[in-house]
Structure formats: structure tokens, C-alpha cells
């Protein structure tokens, strides 16, 4: 090997090595245990993924913008996780054991506690964790991953920041795939906006910084999104990537993997079959309907059990929710809590809720602002796909829009309107949420559509009236409080008026043009 080849080889390795060494130092510094042991563990995990990230970046075009996006996606999630780990014991609730250990969620705390106990007391072999059942991880993936990390890399201290590190790397790996898919299939503007939403969306940052499965699933779904967008160009390669993503999802969530299979089949049906003939079109619709019926019949007992438990938990934790459910009747409580869950995290509630700590107030506002900034663009897009002129493009967007609406509703219903679990399920399909949000903004801007403004005004009406309701709930001596149902009535009436203007204005314009034509 000559000197030039050696220099090139050094340059190839120096970037990932330095990045991994620096990242490992930061992770170890803010984690428990001996610094050198923690640094080595983080370095071993980070280096191979750094090489993968660099390869993905080059494959995605090697643009500086994409590199910035990937670094931002990684840094925000790892930074939030390390900050939370160190700040929660100080600024969290002192009577919550998981917060005193630096965990945002009790689920992650109990799962990690079980994994640490198994790794340190039972000394399992490499394959043994794959065959056992866990009390706090029904899918096994996160528990097995934690056991392996603690047993082989971190036996001296419980460094769950290593799980956060891996999750941040997975999310960052999805960036070049997601952006390239949108850039090639739609246009650069949609691609850039959607990719930045993917990077900065608050709930994605919060859940990724909490040793949860969401960042792993989101990263895999971003890659799967690319495979679906390119399936018509090179179906063998795309199908292989898609299959690999689904298989990797299974240890984290069979439910999400099944949902990914559903949207994949729908996408492929629209892309290749639906436009061939009416037989393929209606055959696919019939098969889809039959599949939904069979799925509901088989899964209904489990779904009812989950929903009943989550709804009951929500009612116990919220006195006013229990009161409202009592007023409307038990037969409507699932529908009410599903709709209520779509509004979670409720921005007015977080703004005025007390008592709470500064940390939880800041995190709550951060999450709620992200969702409420997305909602008008997202729902405008989901209800505007019918207006796309190209038939095949409209069909593809419509199928995906129906899937997203279904996923949002199922997430809300499954979580019983909970302010944490509901957004947690919803954010898993962030690539689809980010795409439709970006597409809606670009579509409205291109056709100069006032309907987007109406969606924004409707949301402002909701925020305004419920801000009054929540503020008066906690500060009754300052302002008169509207009854809940009166508040809902005001919101519905004002929203209906705003919505009606979208139909009245074209009608008036048509009448005027008719008169002008008649004269």
C-alpha cells in the first residue's frame, strides 16, 4: 500500500473514530460508574453505527444539509436523554422512584430494572435472554438488548444512557433514507421540510431520550418509507429492505410491524394493481375489508381488554374526565376518550396546570407546542388529498391518509386518551406524519388555498376557549369558569362558522359570476 492509499484510509477512519470517541466521552461523563469503562462501552456501540451513518449519508447524496440534519437528530435525542437522566433526580417529583433514578417513564424503569437484575445476578449466556419471558417487556427486544449491554459492556454500573445512545443513532440513520425518498418521489421542498420535522419534532426527541423503543421503530420506519417510495423503480432491492425493516421491528413491537405490513400492502396494491382494471381495484377493496373483519374478530377480545384498562386508568387519574364520561354515558366513553386523546398533550392544560415542577412544565409545553403546530397542516393535508388531480397520485395519497387517520385514532383509543401513551404510539409513524405535514403546507402554498388558514383558525378557537376553561379551573378567583359542555358548544359553533365560510364564499362567487354572465 502506497502513502496515498494510507492517507486515504486514515481519512476514511479518522472521522468516525473521532466522532465515536467524543460521543463516548460525553456519554460516560454524564453516566454512572467508572469513566474508562463507560467510555469503552459507548465507543464500542458508537463506532460501527458511525460507519453506517457515514455510509448512509454518502448514499443519500453526501450533502452538507443532510449531515447537519443527521447530527441534529442524533445530538438532540442524546442530549435530551443525558440531561433528563441528570436533571430528573433534582427537578422531578421526589415521591416517584423512576424519576429519582433519572427515568422519564415507569415502563422503562421497570423494564431496565429487570434487565439489570438478570444481567448482574443470573449471568445469562448470549442466547438465553432470547428464549425467556419478561414481566415488563412483552416483545422482549428492549429487555434482551439491555441485558446484553449490561452483561457484556457495562457490568459495573447501570448505564441506561447506552440504550439512549443506540436509539439516537437509529433515528439519525433514518434521515438520509427519508429525505431521499421524498426528494426523488415528490420534490426537494417537501423533502427538506419533512426531514426537519422528523429531526425536530418534540415528542420524538422526548421519547428517544427516555430509553424507549420508539426511536428504534421510527428509524426503521423511515427506512421502510424509502423502500415503499422506490418499490416501483427497483422492487427487488426495495422489497428486501422493507422485509428487513419489518423483521427488525418484530422484537420491538409486533403490533407496529403488523401496521407496517398493512400500509406496505396497501401501497403496493395502489402502485401496481389498482390501476390495472376495476377487478383489481374492487378485489383489493374487498380483500382489505375482509382482512379488517377477520383481524377485528380475532383481536377484539384483546383490544377490549387493553382499551378497558387504559380508559379506566385515565378516568381514575382525572376527576373531570370521569365526571364527563358519567354525563355522556358509559356507552360513549370510548369514543369520547379517543377524540380527547387526539388533543393530547393538551396545550391549554399544560400551560395552566398546577402543582408541577419547572422541569415537567417545560417538557409539557415543548411537547404540546410541537403537536399543536403540526395539527392544522396535518389535518388539512389528510382532508385535501381528494383534490389532487393525478388519479394514481391521489389514490396513493388517499390510502396513506386513511392509514394515518386510522393510526391516530387507534393510538388514541388504545391509550385511553392518556397524555403520554397516546402520543407515544402516535409518534412511532413520524415519517408519515412529517410527510403529510410538509405536503399540506406545500400544497396549500402552491394553490394559494385559504382552507389551511381555516384549519389554523379552528385550532386557535379550540386553544382560546379551553385556555379560559383550564385557567378558570386553577384560578377560579380570577375569572369566571364556563361549564365544560358550554365550552365545547362555543368551540363547535365557532368552528362551524369558520368551516362554513369555505363553502359560502365559492357559492357567492359562483352566483356573482352567473349574474355577470346573464347580463
Predicted regions and their residues:
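Short hydrophobic/aromatic helix or loop-helix immediately within or flanking a transmembrane segment
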Residues: 107-156, 252, 341
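Membrane-interface alpha helices of multi-pass inner-membrane proteins
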Residues: 205, 224-231, 238-260
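Membrane-interface helix-loop-helix junctions at transmembrane boundaries of multi-pass membrane enzymes
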Residues: 184, 231-237, 380-403
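Hydrophobic, aromatic-rich transmembrane alpha-helices
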Residues: 50-51, 179, 345-393
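Transmembrane-helix signature of polytopic, membrane-embedded enzymes
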Residues: 157-164, 178-200
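Transmembrane alpha-helix segments characteristic
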Residues: 16-22, 241-242, 390-413
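Transmembrane helical bundles and short interhelical boundary loops of multi-pass, membrane-embedded
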Residues: 22, 453-519
Amino acid at each position: 500500500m502506497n502513502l496515498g492509499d494510507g492517507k486515504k484510509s486514515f481519512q476514511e477512519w479518522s472521522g468516525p473514530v473521532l466522532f465515536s470517541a467524543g460521543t463516548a466521552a460525553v456519554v460516560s461523563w454524564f453516566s454512572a460508574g467508572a469513566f474508562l469503562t463507560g467510555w469503552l462501552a459507548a465507543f464500542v456501540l458508537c463506532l460501527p453505527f458511525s460507519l453506517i451513518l457515514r455510509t448512509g449519508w454518502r448514499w443519500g447524496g453526501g450533502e452538507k444539509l443532510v449531515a447537519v440534519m443527521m447530527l441534529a437528530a442524533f445530538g438532540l435525542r442524546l442530549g435530551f436523554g443525558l440531561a433528563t437522566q441528570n436533571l430528573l433526580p433534582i427537578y422531578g417529583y421526589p415521591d416517584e422512584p423512576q424519576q429519582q433514578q433519572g427515568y422519564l417513564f415507569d415502563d422503562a424503569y421497570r423494564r431496565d430494572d429487570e434487565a439489570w437484575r438478570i444481567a448482574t445476578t443470573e449471568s445469562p449466556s448470549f442466547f438465553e435472554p432470547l428464549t425467556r419471558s419478561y414481566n415488563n417487556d412483552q416483545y422482549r427486544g428492549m429487555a434482551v438488548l439491555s441485558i446484553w449491554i449490561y452483561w457484556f459492556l457495562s457490568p459495573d454500573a447501570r448505564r441506561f444512557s447506552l440504550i439512549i445512545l443506540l436509539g439516537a443513532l437509529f433515528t439519525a440513520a433514518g434521515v438520509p433514507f427519508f429525505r431521499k425518498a421524498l426528494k426523488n418521489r415528490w420534490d426537494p421542498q417537501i423533502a427538506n421540510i419533512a426531514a426537519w420535522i422528523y429531526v425536530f419534532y418534540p415528542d420524538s426527541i422526548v421519547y428517544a431520550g427516555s430509553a424507549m423503543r420508539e426511536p428504534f421503530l421510527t428509524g426503521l420506519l423511515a427506512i421502510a418509507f424509502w423502500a415503499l417510495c422506490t418499490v416501483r423503480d427497483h422492487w427487488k432491492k426495495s422489497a428486501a429492505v422493507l422485509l428487513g425493516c419489518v423483521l427488525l421491528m418484530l422484537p420491538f413491537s409486533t403490533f407496529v410491524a403488523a401496521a407496517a405490513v398493512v400500509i406496505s400492502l396497501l401501497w403496493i396494491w395502489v402502485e401496481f394493481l389498482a390501476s390495472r382494471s376495476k377487478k383489481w381495484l374492487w378485489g383489493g377493496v374487498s380483500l382489505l375489508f375482509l382482512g379488517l373483519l377477520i383481524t377485528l374478530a380475532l383481536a377484539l377480545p384483546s383490544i377490549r381488554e387493553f382499551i378497558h384498562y387504559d380508559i379506566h386508568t385515565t378516568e381514575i387519574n382525572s376527576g373531570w374526565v370521569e365526571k364527563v364520561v358519567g354525563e355522556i354515558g358509559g356507552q360513549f366513553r370510548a369514543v369520547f376518550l379517543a377524540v380527547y386523546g387526539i388533543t393530547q398533550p393538551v396545550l391549554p392544560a399544560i400551560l395552566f396546570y398546577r402543582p408541577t415542577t419547572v422541569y415537567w412544565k417545560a417538557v409539557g409545553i415543548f411537547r404540546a407546542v410541537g403537536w399543536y403546530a403540526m395539527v392544522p397542516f396535518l389535518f388539512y393535508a389528510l382532508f385535501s388529498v381528494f383534490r389532487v388531480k393525478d388519479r394514481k397520485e391521489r389514490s396513493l395519497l388517499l390510502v396513506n391518509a386513511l392509514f394515518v387517520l386510522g393510526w391516530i385514532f387507534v393510538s388514541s383509543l388504545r391509550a385511553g386518551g392518556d397524555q403520554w401513551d397516546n402520543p407515544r404510539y402516535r409518534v412511532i409513524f413520524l415519517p408519515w406524519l412529517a410527510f403529510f405535514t410538509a405536503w399540506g403546507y406545500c400544497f396549500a402554498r402552491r394553490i394559494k388555498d385559504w382552507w389551511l388558514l381555516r384549519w389554523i383558525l379552528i385550532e386557535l378557537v379550540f386553544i382560546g376557549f379551553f385556555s379560559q376553561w383550564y385557567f378558570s379551573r386553577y384560578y377560579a378567583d380570577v375569572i369566571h369558569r364556563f361549564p365544560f359542555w358550554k365550552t365545547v358548544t362555543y368551540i363547535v359553533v365557532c368552528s362551524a362558522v369558520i368551516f362554513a365560510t369555505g363553502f359560502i364564499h365559492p357559492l357567492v362567487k359562483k352566483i356573482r359570476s352567473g349574474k355577470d354572465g346573464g347580463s
